[in-house]
């Protein structure tokens, strides 16, 4: 099976996972280390910690998919090191109606108008939600505070974001730090291996 077919099959399986689990990813984050990070296990560990940070802050099991990519441009200082992409679900409407204590403290300090709107039963703007998610990501020590270290975008094309995350192939997905059904991925890996051996 050639790389393009394998990648397309992998994306198809991930899309099925999205449909079956009802995930609606809202945010696409690109996180670049301050330095050339060459330890894959450290990057995976950082993904696990960042996922815990998000869930702890919102006090909700927000689903995250993590991808690890290599810097491929030999003219750049991070060449051969890794950076991360994350697809992140938005906090639920219930959570926005009844924010966690950490959310309330953060909003009181950084966005009191939004906290007032919540307490008055009003709507929270997408911009306010985005601002809070960016601050939450920056709470994690592995995420640089500067604009070059973290790029957070709202997702308007989930399929396009998924395709972008898989552009370096199936090895970029970090399943141990992603909310996904391992059975489907394992079955796919087994079937792919069998096709390669017997075709």
Indicate residue ranges for each PLM-predicted region:
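Right-hand nucleic-acid polymerase module
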Residues: 1-82, 90-199
């Amino acid at each position: 099976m050639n790389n393009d077919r394998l990648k397309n099959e992998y994306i198809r399986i991930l899309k099925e996972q999205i449909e079956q689990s009802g995930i609606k990813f809202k945010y696409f984050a690109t996180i670049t280390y301050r330095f050339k990070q060459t330890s894959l296990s450290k990057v995976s560990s950082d993904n696990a910690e960042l996922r815990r940070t998000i869930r702890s802050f919102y006090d909700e099991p927000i689903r995250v998919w993590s991808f690890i990519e290599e810097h491929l441009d030999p003219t750049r200082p991070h060449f051969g090191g890794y950076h991360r992409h994350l697809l992140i679900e938005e906090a639920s409407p219930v959570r926005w109606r009844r924010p966690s204590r950490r959310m309330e403290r953060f909003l009181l300090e950084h966005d009191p108008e939004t906290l007032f709107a919540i307490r008055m039963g009003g709507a929270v703007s997408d911009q306010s939600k985005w601002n809070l998610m960016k601050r939450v990501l920056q709470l994690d020590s592995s995420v640089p505070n500067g604009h070059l270290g973290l790029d957070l975008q709202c997702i308007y094309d989930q399929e396009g974001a998924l395709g972008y995350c898989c552009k370096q192939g199936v090895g970029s997905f970090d399943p141990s730090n992603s909310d996904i059904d391992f059975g489907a991925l394992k079955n796919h890996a087994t079937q792919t291996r069998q096709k390669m051996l017997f075709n």
